[in-house]
Amino acid sequence: MSEDSYNFIDKKIIHDGPVKLRIDSFTYRGKTFKKEVVEHNPSVGIIPRISENEILLIKQFRHAVNRYLVEIPAGKIENNELPHEAAKRELAEETGYMGILQPLTKCFLAPSYDTELMHFFVARDLTKLDNPTKMDEDENIITMNVKLKDAISYCYDGTITD
């Protein structure tokens, strides 16, 4: 199979907010198509290592799916913010810790319809903050100290779905 060319025609913004929604028009193999695209700032995800065998996870309510989810601390990169700056901020906001950040990888989360690129970091040598940063008003976050082997099991048993 070859990489045939896609020819961009137009994009129309249909919602312009912190997250944008647009409709793209393009041609492929002589046919015209339209696709809905969510424009989302890049984001960060942090794996906070408490020790060699233990990490911090969080449990927080996610409105879009109407449930609490167990996940790694994460959040969007604000305008003019570098990925490691966002990771430092999110780690402090969501866990009350600071640490040494090491870049791990990055990946698109849902590239069939969303532009969000998540940068992953490992945080080591964690220190509890004396005056933790306040969470966003709509956040209710519970921190969980979890054995690394249990966190891996959570990925397989459905405890971690985000």
Question: Language-model features: where?
Answer:
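Short glycine/serine/proline-enriched coil/turn segments at secondary-structure junctions
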Residues: D16, A64, A110-Y113
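Nudix hydrolase/Nudix homology domain
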Residues: M1-S2, Y68, N79, S112, ...
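Active-site-adjacent beta-strand/loop module that shapes the phosphate/pyrophosphate-binding cleft
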Residues: R22-R29, P111-D130, M144
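A short, amphipathic edge element
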Residues: M1-K11
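A contiguous pocket-lining binding segment that forms or flanks enzyme active sites
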Residues: L82-R124, T133, E137
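Conserved Nudix-box catalytic region and its N-terminal flanking loop in Nudix hydrolases
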Residues: S2, G45-R89, E137
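Short loop segments at secondary-structure junctions
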Residues: R29, I50-E52, F61, R124-K128, ...
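Acidic, metal-coordinating catalytic segment for phosphate/diphosphate chemistry
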Residues: I9-G45, S51
